[in-house]
Amino acid sequence: MRKITSILLTCVMGCTATYAADWDGVPVPANPGSGKTWELHPLSDDFNYEAPAAGKSTRFYERWKEGFINPWTGPGLTEWHPHYSYVSGGKLAITSGRKPGTNQVYLGSITSKAPLTYPVYMEARAKLSNMVLASDFWFLSADSTEEIDVIEAYGSDRPGQEWYAERLHLSHHVFIRDPFQDYQPTDAGSWYADGKGTKWRDAFHRVGVYWRDPWHLEYYVDGKLVRTVSGQDIIDPNGFTGGTGLSKPMYAIINMEDQNWRSDNGITPTDAELADPNRNTYYVDWVRFYKPVPINGNATTVELGNFHNTGKDGANVTGDTVLGFNKNGNNINYNTKGDWADYTVNLPAAGEYRVDLVIASPMSSGLGAELTFAGNAAKTVTLSNTGGWESYQTFTLPQTISVSSPGNYNFRLKSTGSSNWQWNGDEIRFVKL
């Protein structure tokens, strides 16, 4: 059932500090904002495992599925095929080949099982294929109306393709699907060249986007800020999003494509190119995702799975077989309207504390939490959709708490709001101000 946090993914979330990831020591180039720091998101993947083309592996399927966000098999001559992606030697490989007896092209595509939402920094270390095909790392909403392209590039060394080989397409789209309308920026800055003649197929490069908010994107190449798009005039000048900008949760997609605008002009791979393993593969060393969270140098943290009593106020919810919070490792799930749990926290000093709650939920509305601390009047916070049951975000209560002396304090955390199904919980933090 989707409301159950997988034990393996919980370990990934809770244990990221216990092993060295490939990106350790590589700073996030974007600024998380005043009083904030970067927190690694569990969708991050260093691909340091094996997943064969046919059958993949449990580790792969924790985060990814083969194919697209829906049954569509790709643009133009593309046909995404599950056996044209694999993980080996510490890298994800997206490959290509001819579909027998046709002019179509088999290509690999993988899509994240859970979406992401702003604010988030998303980056890949990748090496383009040496093909006229697009090598892609991009993000798309479930209804295919909002898109962010981190990597969209064409690495071929074929004569006549030099201009594209030296550029990365750094862009986004907003769509109306019926009748179909598509906007993306067309300014010169959307095609990035570093001025050094770099061919992006020749080596691995880091390309990232900080999706700061619905109206602001920052693009980074090898740690350098190379493009910023900000404001309605460039994000959505035609109002296709109805004034909300790039606001919808989006799924991560890594794939290759034979795109119409190229194949319609005769720019499509030959059989020889498709059969050449030295050019037909797009490699991704790692992908990483970070959320900006408050700095917690003076924080006391309580894991939400470490309650000493739990229960429920109100009627049972259909499908919820657990009374109160369900302990799942250090986290909680099966949380429905009216569920509560009691905790104890040891605060190190007298004074005022900010309270941060780390939760995840795909529910579109009606989410909330209530904190009753040391028997005082309850404090409430309205929560919102984070993009999935495993996409955790930090929410800060609008009111602080104060204690007159250090020591142990009891508190109760309760789910509130109109939605029957509420949120999965990670931790609550008390930050000394």
UniProtKB/Swiss-Prot annotation:
Recombinant agarase was produced extracellularly using B.subtilis as a host. The protein expressed in B.subtilis was detected as the catalytic domain composed of amino acid residues from 19 to 300, probably due to proteolytic cleavage. It comes from the Bacteria. GO terms for biological process: carbohydrate metabolic process. Optimum temperature is around 55 degrees Celsius. Is stable up to 60 degrees Celsius and retains more than 80% of the original activity even after heating at 65 degrees Celsius for 15 min. Monomer. Its EC number is 3.2.1.81. Residues 21-295 form the GH16 domain. Belongs to the glycosyl hydrolase 16 family. Its main location: periplasm. Endo-type beta-agarase, which produces neoagarotetraose (NA4) as the main final product, with a small amount of neoagarohexaose (NA6) and neoagarobiose (NA2). Gene3D superfamilies: 2.60.120.200, Galactose-binding domain-like (2.60.120.260). Residues 300-431 form the CBM6 domain. It is found in: Periplasm. Keywords: Glycosidase, Hydrolase, Periplasm, Signal. One of its GO terms (molecular function) is carbohydrate binding. This is Beta-agarase AgaA. GO terms for cellular component: periplasmic space. Activity is abolished by Hg(2+), Cu(2+), Pb(2+) and Zn(2+) ions, but is not affected by NaCl up to at least 1.0 M, Mg(2+), K(+) and Ca(2+). Not affected by iodoacetamide, p-chloromercuribenzoate, dithiothreitol, 2-mercaptoethanol, EDTA and sodium dodecyl sulfate. Inhibited by N-bromosuccinimide. Optimum pH is around 7.0.
